[in-house]
């Protein structure tokens, strides 16, 4: 693995812990260069990529696809419902097959935590693995686009007061972000229902009531309530959650003028955030979506650099 002039070389991208700080900053800066139109794009038509999504996705799936097509890669169609998965084929055997067919990169989202371990450790699978989200584990590409969005706004991470709010236990976005933001020097706070908070998060920040910290925040990162990962026993209503933990109009008015609001989406309007605030002046939710394409271009380029030994 290496970084030269913001050009990164990676074998796989499965978690934020696996990246050095230099690689993280290199990917962010390279994404910014793609966004500014400063990168001359090489011909990658011979490079094959398959997006293997076993959970529903709009932003991650389609922004990877846009990124791949902007880079000129050949994108292989894959529909889990129309594949041998419906006949009981395992993820491992699916990826083994794609690799045997000559696929260079597999971008994968799967409901199982750490699904990627047996794939990257396999002596037979030669395709590089990019983790598009594993269960409640990690979401490295979302984390990197979040970092780009923050860096565009403030030009730094050191000393920023950032709150990550909501469904913390079930959020792969929260886990990826808290680990790297702590490493980059941000001051982290967490809030949300106590039953969705783990003491393991104390290693990264402070659990606090939203109304105690909101006036001091630079970044408020809201998380989607992930109903699909709950057991059906919730102790709150939609309205109750919004009033207790959501970004209401009243709380929005207490934010600093320079503060920004983030959300990985999809948004549960009037739950995590008031409907009228999704596109408010302090909101950067649409910017996050746009930045996803450029960061994912940087990720795909980094994998190709690693495979082709370009650096």
UniProtKB/Swiss-Prot annotation:
GO molecular function, one term: aspartate carbamoyltransferase activity
EC number: 2.1.3.2
Example of a GO cellular component annotation carried by this entry: cytosol
Keyword set, alphabetical order: Pyrimidine biosynthesis, Transferase
Binding residues annotated for carbamoyl phosphate, in chain numbering: 59-60, 109, 139, 142, 265-266
Origin superkingdom: Bacteria
Pathway(s) of this molecule: Pyrimidine metabolism; UMP biosynthesis via de novo pathway; (S)-dihydroorotate from bicarbonate: step 2/3
InterPro entries tied to this protein: Asp/Orn_carbamoyltranf_P-bd, Asp/Orn_carbamoylTrfase, Asp/Orn_carbamoylTrfase_sf, Asp_carbamoyltransf, Asp_carbamoyltransf_Asp/Orn-bd
Residues given in the record as L-aspartate binding sites: 87, 172, 224
Catalytic activity: carbamoyl phosphate + L-aspartate = N-carbamoyl-L-aspartate + phosphate + H(+)
Any matching Pfam family: OTCace
Gene Ontology BP, a term: amino acid metabolic process
Classification via NCBIfam families: asp_carb_tr (TIGR00670), PRK00856.1 (NF002032)
Family to which the UniProt record says this protein belongs: Belongs to the aspartate/ornithine carbamoyltransferase superfamily. ATCase family.
Stated role: Catalyzes the condensation of carbamoyl phosphate and aspartate to form carbamoyl aspartate and inorganic phosphate, the committed step in the de novo pyrimidine nucleotide biosynthesis pathway.
Subunit structure, interactors included: Heterododecamer (2C3:3R2) of six catalytic PyrB chains organized as two trimers (C3), and six regulatory PyrI chains organized as three dimers (R2).
Annotated protein name in UniProt: Aspartate carbamoyltransferase catalytic subunit
Lineage summary: Bacteria, Bacillati, Bacillota, Bacilli, Lactobacillales
């Amino acid at each position: 693995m290496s970084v030269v002039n913001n050009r990164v070389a990676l074998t796989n991208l499965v978690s934020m812990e696996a990246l050095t700080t230099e690689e993280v900053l290199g990917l962010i800066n390279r994404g910014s260069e793609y966004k500014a139109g400063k990168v001359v794009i090489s011909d990658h038509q011979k490079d094959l990529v398959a997006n293997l999504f076993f959970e529903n996705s709009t932003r991650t799936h389609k922004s990877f696809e846009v990124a791949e097509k902007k880079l000129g890669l050949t994108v292989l169609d894959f529909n889990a419902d129309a594949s041998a998965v419906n006949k009981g084929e395992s993820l491992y055997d699916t990826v083994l097959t794609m690799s045997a067919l000559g696929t260079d990169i597999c971008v994968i989202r799967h409901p199982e935590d750490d699904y990627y371990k047996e794939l990257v450790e396999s002596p037979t699978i030669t395709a590089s693995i990019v983790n598009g989200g594993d269960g409640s584990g990690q979401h490295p590409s979302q984390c990197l686009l979040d970092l780009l969005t923050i860096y565009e706004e403030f030009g730094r991470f050191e000393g920023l007061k950032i709150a990550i709010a909501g469904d913390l236990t079930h959020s792969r976005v929260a886990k990826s972000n808290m680990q790297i933001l702590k490493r980059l020097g941000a001051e982290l706070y967490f809030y949300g229902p106590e039953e969705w908070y783990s003491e393991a998060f104390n290693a990264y920040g402070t659990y606090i009531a939203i109304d105690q910290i909101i006036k001091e925040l630079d970044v408020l990162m809201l998380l989607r309530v992930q109903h699909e990962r709950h057991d059906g026993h919730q102790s709150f209503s939609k309205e109750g959650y919004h009033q207790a933990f959501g970004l209401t109009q009243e709380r929005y008015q207490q934010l600093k003028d320079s503060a920004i609001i983030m959300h990985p989406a999809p948004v549960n309007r009037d739950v995590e955030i008031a409907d009228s605030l999704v596109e408010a002046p302090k909101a950067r939710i649409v910017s996050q979506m746009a930045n996803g394409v450029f960061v994912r271009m940087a990720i795909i380029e980094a994998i190709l650099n690693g495979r082709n030994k370009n650096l």
